Amino acid sequence: MYPFGVHAVMLRRPVSVIELPGYRQRADELLGAAEQDAIVDLIAYEPTCGDLIPGTGGLRKVRVGRRGSGKRGGARVIYYFYNAAFPLLLVALYAKNEKADLSAAEKKKFAALVKEITDQWRKK
Protein backbone atom coordinates (compact mmCIF):
# COMPACT_ATOMS: atom_id res chain seq x y z
CA MET A 1 0.00 0.00 0.00
CA TYR A 2 2.90 2.37 0.71
CA PRO A 3 6.05 2.92 -1.32
CA PHE A 4 9.26 1.33 -0.17
CA GLY A 5 10.65 3.05 2.91
CA VAL A 6 7.36 4.63 4.02
CA HIS A 7 5.98 3.40 7.30
CA ALA A 8 2.57 4.13 8.76
CA VAL A 9 1.09 3.23 12.10
CA MET A 10 -2.08 1.17 11.73
CA LEU A 11 -4.20 1.30 14.85
CA ARG A 12 -6.56 -1.42 16.06
CA ARG A 13 -9.04 1.21 17.15
CA PRO A 14 -9.63 4.28 15.03
CA VAL A 15 -8.75 7.76 16.20
CA SER A 16 -11.68 10.15 16.58
CA VAL A 17 -11.91 12.42 13.54
CA ILE A 18 -13.16 16.01 13.46
CA GLU A 19 -13.88 17.62 10.11
CA LEU A 20 -13.22 21.36 10.32
CA PRO A 21 -15.69 23.58 8.40
CA GLY A 22 -13.28 24.42 5.55
CA TYR A 23 -12.56 20.74 4.98
CA ARG A 24 -16.25 19.82 5.18
CA GLN A 25 -17.23 22.38 2.54
CA ARG A 26 -14.56 21.26 0.08
CA ALA A 27 -15.30 17.58 0.70
CA ASP A 28 -18.93 18.16 -0.23
CA GLU A 29 -17.83 19.99 -3.40
CA LEU A 30 -15.16 17.54 -4.57
CA LEU A 31 -16.09 14.08 -3.29
CA GLY A 32 -19.00 11.71 -3.08
CA ALA A 33 -20.19 10.28 0.23
CA ALA A 34 -18.36 6.96 -0.29
CA GLU A 35 -15.08 8.77 -1.04
CA GLN A 36 -15.49 10.93 2.06
CA ASP A 37 -16.13 7.87 4.22
CA ALA A 38 -13.08 6.10 2.74
CA ILE A 39 -10.85 9.07 3.62
CA VAL A 40 -12.09 9.15 7.21
CA ASP A 41 -11.57 5.38 7.54
CA LEU A 42 -8.06 5.50 6.05
CA ILE A 43 -6.84 8.35 8.22
CA ALA A 44 -8.61 7.20 11.40
CA TYR A 45 -6.93 3.78 11.25
CA GLU A 46 -3.61 4.94 9.75
CA PRO A 47 -3.09 8.45 11.11
CA THR A 48 0.56 8.65 10.09
CA CYS A 49 -0.08 7.68 6.46
CA GLY A 50 0.37 11.26 5.23
CA ASP A 51 3.65 13.07 4.73
CA LEU A 52 4.57 15.75 7.27
CA ILE A 53 4.43 19.25 5.78
CA PRO A 54 7.38 21.37 6.95
CA GLY A 55 6.52 24.71 8.56
CA THR A 56 2.98 23.79 9.57
CA GLY A 57 3.27 22.68 13.17
CA GLY A 58 2.72 19.02 12.33
CA LEU A 59 0.17 18.97 9.53
CA ARG A 60 0.23 16.03 7.16
CA LYS A 61 -0.80 15.64 3.52
CA VAL A 62 -2.13 12.48 1.95
CA ARG A 63 -3.09 11.87 -1.68
CA VAL A 64 -6.50 10.40 -2.34
CA GLY A 65 -8.19 9.35 -5.55
CA ARG A 66 -11.33 10.92 -6.96
CA ARG A 67 -13.85 9.53 -9.38
CA GLY A 68 -12.33 9.73 -12.83
CA SER A 69 -9.01 11.13 -11.60
CA GLY A 70 -7.17 8.37 -9.77
CA LYS A 71 -4.69 8.98 -6.97
CA ARG A 72 -2.14 11.07 -8.92
CA GLY A 73 -4.73 13.46 -10.32
CA GLY A 74 -7.04 13.26 -7.36
CA ALA A 75 -7.20 15.34 -4.23
CA ARG A 76 -4.99 16.20 -1.29
CA VAL A 77 -6.19 15.97 2.30
CA ILE A 78 -4.48 18.17 4.87
CA TYR A 79 -4.87 16.91 8.43
CA TYR A 80 -3.37 17.09 11.90
CA PHE A 81 -2.55 14.08 14.07
CA TYR A 82 -1.02 14.69 17.49
CA ASN A 83 -1.59 11.33 19.21
CA ALA A 84 -4.26 8.66 19.60
CA ALA A 85 -5.78 10.43 22.62
CA PHE A 86 -6.28 13.68 20.66
CA PRO A 87 -8.91 13.85 17.90
CA LEU A 88 -7.48 13.89 14.40
CA LEU A 89 -8.39 17.12 12.58
CA LEU A 90 -9.27 17.15 8.89
CA VAL A 91 -8.20 20.70 8.06
CA ALA A 92 -8.30 21.23 4.29
CA LEU A 93 -8.92 19.49 0.99
CA TYR A 94 -8.06 20.55 -2.54
CA ALA A 95 -7.95 19.01 -6.00
CA LYS A 96 -4.45 18.52 -7.36
CA ASN A 97 -5.36 20.46 -10.50
CA GLU A 98 -6.15 23.49 -8.30
CA LYS A 99 -2.69 23.71 -6.74
CA ALA A 100 0.36 21.58 -6.03
CA ASP A 101 1.05 22.57 -2.43
CA LEU A 102 -0.05 24.90 0.33
CA SER A 103 1.20 28.47 0.01
CA ALA A 104 3.46 29.96 2.70
CA ALA A 105 0.51 32.04 3.94
CA GLU A 106 -1.71 28.94 4.18
CA LYS A 107 1.00 27.05 6.06
CA LYS A 108 1.32 29.91 8.54
CA LYS A 109 -2.46 30.21 8.95
CA PHE A 110 -2.95 26.47 9.47
CA ALA A 111 0.00 26.27 11.89
CA ALA A 112 -1.59 29.01 14.02
CA LEU A 113 -4.96 27.25 13.88
CA VAL A 114 -3.47 23.92 14.96
CA LYS A 115 -1.56 25.59 17.80
CA GLU A 116 -4.70 27.33 19.04
CA ILE A 117 -6.76 24.13 18.95
CA THR A 118 -4.11 22.00 20.64
CA ASP A 119 -3.49 24.65 23.31
CA GLN A 120 -7.21 24.70 24.11
CA TRP A 121 -7.35 20.89 24.14
CA ARG A 122 -4.45 20.63 26.58
CA LYS A 123 -6.19 23.02 29.01
CA LYS A 124 -9.05 20.54 29.48
Question: Model-predicted segments: where are they?
Answer:
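Arg/Lys-rich, positively charged N-terminal/basic patches that mediate binding to nucleic acids
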Residues: 1-34, 119
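Enriched for short, Lys/Arg-rich terminal
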Residues: 4-9, 13, 81-124
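A generic structural signal for short beta-strands and their flanking turns/coil linkers
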Residues: 19, 39, 56-60
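Active-site phosphate/pyrophosphate-handling residues
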Residues: 21, 76, 108
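Compact soluble domain cores
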Residues: 22, 31-51
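Residues that form generic nucleotide/phosphate-binding pockets
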Residues: 26, 42, 113-116
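Amphipathic alpha-helical transducer elements in NTP-driven molecular machines
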Residues: 33-36, 72, 107, 111
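Basic/aromatic recognition patch in beta-strand/loop cores that engages polyanionic ligands
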Residues: 49-93, 98
